[in-house]
């Protein structure tokens, strides 16, 4: 049955087991599809996360903030408060376009394959052919002779786009001979304390132990008309 047509049946079951505290109707705003105008259905799905605390990413990011110059100074407080309270970073998305999340998962226990040789092989293929190779190549090409593709599920998730943007310091500053890492300044609007400044800080603090910038300048906005 449709999820919205079984509400009362679910309530009856809860009541039957003595688990229903109250039943009534509330008028409130609710997200609807911009296409069909139908109410959205929320569904929990398995995702991939980067822990903020298991390997001290939060603390590394906070120390990076303290070592960064902010213009104006209140930008430091804004970004710091976000890092202090943010949850683990969900880096997977279910889309038909984007950069694939290159993970193989053991079928027998659901654990990801952790093998630096496989990771390097995937990275080499990505660099030569682009990330679409993940979707077009046979899994055995990435796994090599050591593993059987029959033992793994190949993920079809993509990496969330803010991880993409947060990685630009690596493939721009570290790849071009006319540029140096870290950047002297990142310059953007105040919305990027939650966006580019934020994701760049986490990605770089996790992989390089510091922010990818020496300073951050937050500019204002101009509205035309």
Predicted features along the sequence, with ranges:
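Residue patterns forming the tRNA-binding/recognition surfaces of aminoacyl-tRNA synthetases
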Residues: 1-115
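Conserved active-site neighborhood of enzyme catalytic/cofactor-binding cores
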Residues: 6, 81-82, 86-88, 92-225
């Amino acid at each position: 049955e449709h999820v919205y047509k079984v509400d009362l049946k679910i309530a009856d079951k809860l009541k039957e087991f003595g688990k229903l505290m109250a039943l009534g109707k509330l008028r409130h705003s609710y997200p609807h599809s911009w296409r069909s105008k139908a109410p959205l259905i929320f569904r929990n799905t398995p995702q991939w996360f980067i822990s903020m605390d298991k390997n001290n990413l939060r603390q590394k990011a906070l120390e990076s903030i303290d070592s960064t110059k902010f213009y104006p100074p209140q930008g430091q407080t804004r970004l710091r408060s976000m890092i202090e309270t943010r949850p683990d970073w969900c880096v997977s998305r279910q889309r038909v376009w984007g950069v694939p999340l290159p993970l193989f998962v053991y079928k027998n226990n659901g654990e990801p394959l952790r093998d630096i040789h496989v990771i390097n092989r995937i990275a080499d293929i990505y660099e030569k052919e682009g990330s679409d190779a993940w979707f077009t190549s046979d899994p055995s090409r990435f796994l090599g002779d050591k593993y059987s593709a029959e033992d793994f599920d190949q993920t079809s998730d993509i990496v969330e786009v803010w991880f993409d943007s947060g990685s630009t310091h690596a493939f721009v500053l570290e790849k071009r001979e006319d540029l140096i890492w870290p950047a002297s300044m990142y310059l953007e609007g105040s919305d990027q304390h939650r966006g580019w400044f934020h994701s760049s800080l986490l990605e770089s603090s996790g992989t390089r132990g510091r922010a990818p910038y020496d300073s951050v300048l937050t500019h204002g906005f101009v509205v035309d008309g």
